[in-house]
């Protein structure tokens, strides 16, 4: 299966993979032995790992996101005609109290919890669960993993830092797609100074923090993501081996293949130069290889697109969809991303 190639490639190079991680972390012989062979029923289920997303409540309205994943997007979505005013803004688990009760019953068994959203650090249910775990004396036995936008570490009466200090492990995968003004455009409502301040606070106050960045690469941030990675390593916000890059496929108007051939060629050159820079870093080879593979997979994706690319200029990269969104939000994409000045369609600015 083609989708499995990334894990196999990592393992062929002697590195860990998500496949290997799950097979190693969640291999419980007693579960296999207790499972009924006829209906796969487990009479005394003990949950070790939970992946939970309580709702779509979020403080950001990222360009490539939608109201289904962020409540902050709802107003723009209605104005643009993407959502009906009658549709619910908040999409959440139907009976949160019942779910929490079921999770509370499993606290003595849980080893790891993955929180995503929405934005998990602004969900009251998330804080209720952490406090319950602490009250039961289980925090030192449980690792927490987050996908968070790093916009804030506090919400209402809660501050996540003193809670995290009590848990066994804290792994953060920061959803950051760009830096400075580009980052603020891509993840609307975020303030870059706050992001850096939050990272620095965590480094000081949560010493067992495992901090990673997990950018989603679209054509818009395709140049800047390299600068983001290098800046974060040079500022010691991350170490080598701490980038988990995802290639955007949807919404399709933001996919990498929308770029003209000239830009795709330039990106291959930029990424290859960045890979050479990674090789010079003072870090273990296995960690450097992880970062190299993260960028090499983008190069491969671009080259595959170049093979079938027909540059007839009929297909616009900066679409009317994006132009309408920028007008609504009163931002000028080309002022923030001058590297794409050649893509500007004056018709959209009349």
Where are these regions (language model features)?
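Core AdoMet radical
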Residues: 47-57, 68-95, 108-124, 136-156, ...
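Alpha-helical packing segments of well-folded alpha/beta enzyme cores
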Residues: 1-3, 50, 99-102, 129, ...
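Generic marker of residues within folded, mature protein domains
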Residues: 42-44, 136, 203
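Leucine-rich repeat
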Residues: 100-106, 131-137, 161-165
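Distinct, well-ordered alpha-helical segments
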Residues: 127-131, 155-162, 224-228
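N-terminal pre-core extensions flanking Radical SAM catalytic domains
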Residues: 1-90, 106-107, 291-350
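Conserved C-terminal portion of the radical SAM core fold
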Residues: 143, 167-173, 192-348
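Short, well-ordered alpha-helices that flank and scaffold nucleotide-derived cofactor binding pockets
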Residues: 67, 131, 135, 234
């Amino acid at each position: 299966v083609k989708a499995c190639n990334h894990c196999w490639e990592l393992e062929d190079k002697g590195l860990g993979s998500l496949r290997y991680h799950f097979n190693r972390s969640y291999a419980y012989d007693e579960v296999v032995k207790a499972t009924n062979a006829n209906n796969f029923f487990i009479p005394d289920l003990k949950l070790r790992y939970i992946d939970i997303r309580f709702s779509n409540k979020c403080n950001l309205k990222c360009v490539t996101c939608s109201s289904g994943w962020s409540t902050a997007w709802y107003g723009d979505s209605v104005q643009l005609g993407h959502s009906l005013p009658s549709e619910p803004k908040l999409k959440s688990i139907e009976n949160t109290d019942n779910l929490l009760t079921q999770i509370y019953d499993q606290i003595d068994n849980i080893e790891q919890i993955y929180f995503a959203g929405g934005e998990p650090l602004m969900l009251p249910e998330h804080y209720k669960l952490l406090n319950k775990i602490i009250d039961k004396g289980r925090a030192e036995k449980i690792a927490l993993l987050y996908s968070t936008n790093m916009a804030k570490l506090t919400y209402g009466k809660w501050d996540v830092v003193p809670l995290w200090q009590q848990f066994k492990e804290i792994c953060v995968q920061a959803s950051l797609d760009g830096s400075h003004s580009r980052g603020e455009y891509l993840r609307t409502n975020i303030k870059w100074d706050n992001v850096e301040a939050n990272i620095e606070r965590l480094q000081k106050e949560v010493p067992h923090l495992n901090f990673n960045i997990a950018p989603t690469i679209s054509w818009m941030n395709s140049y800047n993501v390299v600068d983001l990675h290098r800046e974060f390593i040079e500022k010691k916000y991350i170490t080598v081996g701490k980038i988990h890059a995802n290639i955007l496929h949807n919404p399709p108007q933001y996919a990498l293949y929308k770029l003209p051939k000239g830009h795709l060629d330039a990106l291959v050159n930029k990424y290859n130069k960045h890979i050479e820079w990674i090789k010079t870093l003072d870090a273990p080879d296995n960690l450097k290889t992880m970062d190299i593979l993260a960028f090499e997979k983008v190069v491969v994706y671009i080259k595959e697109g170049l093979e079938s690319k027909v540059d007839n200029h009929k297909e616009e990269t900066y679409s009317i969809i994006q132009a309408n969104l920028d007008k609504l939000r009163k931002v000028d994409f080309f002022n923030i991303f001058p590297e794409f000045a050649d893509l500007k369609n004056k018709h959209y600015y009349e």
